[in-house]
Structure formats: structure tokens, C-alpha cells
A protein has these predicted regions:
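Extended, subdomain-level signal for the structured scaffold at the beginning of enzyme domains
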Residues: 1-95, 102-107, 112-113
């Protein structure tokens, strides 16, 4: 099981880092949790810089995807080239989002039959 936590520039640390910490406590050999970002490093809304584990392309093939929130979510969804890199499949992936991350799910073409639900 690969779980990708999609994290953009201006991310909210509470969303991405708590999800990473809690999910990494599951100790199964086939369990992997990754921070997925459009660049090798992203800076949070409070200046915390983290390195990405996987790309957005790799997040698109993960078994589950969690999209975190951030200060720049509206800019993210307005960036058509950036959004095109995130190819999510609601019929084959477990999708979730936190707070404004639901805007990313809604803008990524998720089916209206399976609307995003924020945490």
C-alpha cells in the first residue's frame, strides 16, 4: 500500500506532517507513506522546508492519496500545468483531502459521484 500525501508550496504543516507521522506508525512491510510534491523541496506557510519523497507523477499511481491544505491552494488549482501533472483516479485510488485540499480534488476532475470530503 502506497499512500501519497500531496504537499504544495505554502502547505499547512498540521495537514502534511501529522498525516505523515501517524500513518508511518503502521509497521507493515508493504506499507509506504510518502510526501509528494511538484518540486524537490516545498516551504510551508510558516517557513518549514521539507524534501519530497516522490513526484506528483508517482502520487498519481499511489493506492491512496491525501491532499493537504495550504495558503496557496487557490494558486495551485489555477495553475493548469501543475494540475495536469496530478492524474487521480477515484475509481482505482482511495482519495482524501484536508481543508482546502478538497479544492485540489474537485479541480482534478474527481467524479461528481464521489465528491471529496474534507477531514
Amino acid at each position: 500500500m502506497h499512500i501519497a500525501i500531496v504537499t504544495f508550496e505554502g502547505y499547512n504543516e498540521l495537514d502534511s506532517l501529522i498525516a505523515l507521522g501517524v500513518l508511518n506508525r503502521v509497521r507493515k512491510t508493504d506499507w509506504r507513506v510518502s510526501i509528494a510534491s511538484p518540486s524537490p523541496r516545498v516551504r510551508s506557510m510558516n517557513g518549514v522546508v521539507i524534501e519530497s519523497h516522490v513526484s506528483l507523477d508517482q502520487a498519481s499511481t499511489a493506492d491512496a492519496v491525501i491532499v493537504g491544505s495550504g495558503r496557496q491552494t487557490r494558486e495551485v488549482v489555477a495553475d493548469k500545468a501543475l494540475m495536469a501533472r496530478l492524474q487521480l483516479d477515484p475509481s482505482g485510488q482511495l482519495l482524501g483531502a484536508q481543508c482546502s485540499g478538497t479544492l485540489v480534488l474537485a479541480s482534478s476532475g474527481c467524479s461528481p459521484e464521489s465528491p471529496p470530503a474534507p477531514t
